[in-house]
Amino acid sequence: MTAFNCLLNKNFAIISMDTLASDSISKKPLKFVSKIHSIPHINCIICGTGSLNAIYSWITWVNQHNIMSINDLNHLAENDMPNILYRYKDKTTIYMFGFDEKSNELLGFAYRSEKHYKSEKMKYSFCYKPTEMYSTNSESIMTELENNIKNNTIEEFLFNLMKKQKEYDDKLPTNKKVGIGGICQILILQHDGFNLINYKKFNDYNKIKDKLVKNNEIL
């Protein structure tokens, strides 16, 4: 699992995710990975939460086929994604973003394993997960978001939000954790392309990195 935060409107998408991959049961850190992936020739972004193997399988499939737009991709996903990803048992959601061929407005789609990867068109809004730390006061996060948009500090807002998500997640029992860490990556998708940055590292980045190197899990 992972942290996933996304602001959508008709002209752009701003997405932030962390880079820590953990074992689905023990939540032991396994590696650092990039979870936001681009398909530049159609100005499309694919990312997801849950099974990395499922997400990577779908990205590989997309790159093996002749696709001209997010419209094509969504149509193919509705038909083919369930057949490709049925073998992966972990709860998984795949997100795809791009611009409509006719209106040139941004489209976002979610495909959830528990709904057999049925295509769901996303609303223009701000979505975030995990959500529990704001479950009793969801209005506060929207107020923070609006203030940061006005002040042109959206990247810092997304990083601070993810820090809160990580702090909350780190305190949970192992079977409740999603596992958040590494680097906060932020992507901005617009009509003329996209920009992906490694915004900031979390405080325990070096500690986890040292453990992975020591255990020969990355070299």
Where would I find each of the regions flagged by the language model?
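N-terminal nucleophile
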Residues: 1-219
